[in-house]
């Protein structure tokens, strides 16, 4: 199982989502930004690192929100979502084609990563 973290960054009742680069696995799908936890990392440290590497932003990782397990065709992931706050940095995309700020309801019209769907359901209820 692959352990993955995702950031739930909220500003003015909208959430940050990012579109995976077309050359990556599941390219073209939208997702909450984040990535894989490397050996020896806590989920929070991994998330701070991924957000800096992929979006060029410094963040403060907040509360754990939820986790979800998803089976893809060739692998299984456990996705852990955390609240995150952008502290500094201008968005520079290295792993994504674009970003968007959307409401939880608007996410339903985006081609979201399947692993993120349970997080969207949670956000819509809370």
Language-model features: locations:
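Conserved hydrophobic "DFG−1" position in protein kinase catalytic cores
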Residues: 9-10, 17, 84-86, 101
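Conserved N-terminal beta-strand and adjoining loop/helix that marks the start
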Residues: 1-16, 36
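Short secondary-structure junctions
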Residues: 54-61
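Conserved Nudix-box catalytic region and its N-terminal flanking loop in Nudix hydrolases
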Residues: 14-53
């Amino acid at each position: 199982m692959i352990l993955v973290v995702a950031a739930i960054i909220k500003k003015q009742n909208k959430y940050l989502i990012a579109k995976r680069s077309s050359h990556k696995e599941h390219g073209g799908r939208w997702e909450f930004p984040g990535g894989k936890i490397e050996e020896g990392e806590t989920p929070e440290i991994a998330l701070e690192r991924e957000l800096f590497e992929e979006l060029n932003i410094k963040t403060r990782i907040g509360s754990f929100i939820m986790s979800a397990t998803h089976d893809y065709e060739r692998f299984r992931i456990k996705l852990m979502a955390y609240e995150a706050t952008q502290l500094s940095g201008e968005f520079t995309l290295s792993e994504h084609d674009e970003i968007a700020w959307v409401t939880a309801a608007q996410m339903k019209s985006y081609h979201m990563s399947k692993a993120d769907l349970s997080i969207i359901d949670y956000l819509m209820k809370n």
